[in-house]
């Protein structure tokens, strides 16, 4: 296998699509903390470090889950499953990236490095190893891994975590269950076959649809409170986006199908992305 093919395999295992959303959360966190006269340069080591650490965590996850990935159609073609990267390689390379990413966080401050490392620890040890194979609460508690990215971004400029910074991380924590349960509902049989107790594999489609709607509903007050802290423009924009999210959640309850679930999954991605982009834009205006 050529070096170029190996690099492509690791990039695929690094899940750049997922990592890019974490990066956006980190940058949004930094801009949320930004005040006139503060240098934006600390964003650079935080961004690079967070990206490397997040990719490292994803690669380690793929190394750990090879056996279960083999029986899931969604993951059966991962480089770790088809043999391009073995378990030992994935864990070693992923660990090196996570360590390097955390080290870059120290260029800003200890708190930023701590949150970068915390995201890795929660994703690997709490979510992947401890909770995912054992309880449907896996993605609920594991959502704090995403929160850590936002907190790393916020602290990169402030070296402290205030209420507004905490709210951004808590928003991501609240967003995570409904988002991933929507995906798990579509691939419910995969999780059943792999013996993962993801909520849709445990309680069925109808109850899962209700849980997704409830999860999304509980998130919205956090979104609106964060919008209130930012400014009126953000509050109005967040309100409009939240209304559409609730509309899709209501449709999923009325028609709990895989097709509606994937629509909810796709829009929840767009929803969070737009919330984060709006936060950045209003700070630049």
UniProtKB/Swiss-Prot annotation:
It catalyses: heme b + (2E,6E)-farnesyl diphosphate + H2O = Fe(II)-heme o + diphosphate. It is a multi-pass membrane protein. GO terms for biological process: heme O biosynthetic process. Its EC number is 2.5.1.141. Pathway: Porphyrin-containing compound metabolism; heme O biosynthesis; heme O from protoheme: step 1/1. One of its GO terms (molecular function) is protoheme IX farnesyltransferase activity. It comes from the Archaea. It is found in: Cell membrane. The chain crosses the membrane at residues 13-33, 40-60, 89-109, 110-130, 137-157, 165-185, 194-214, 218-238, 265-285. The keyword RNA-binding does not apply. Its main location: membrane. HAMAP family: CyoE_CtaB. Belongs to the UbiA prenyltransferase family. Protoheme IX farnesyltransferase subfamily. PANTHER family: PROTOHEME IX FARNESYLTRANSFERASE, MITOCHONDRIAL. This is Protoheme IX farnesyltransferase.
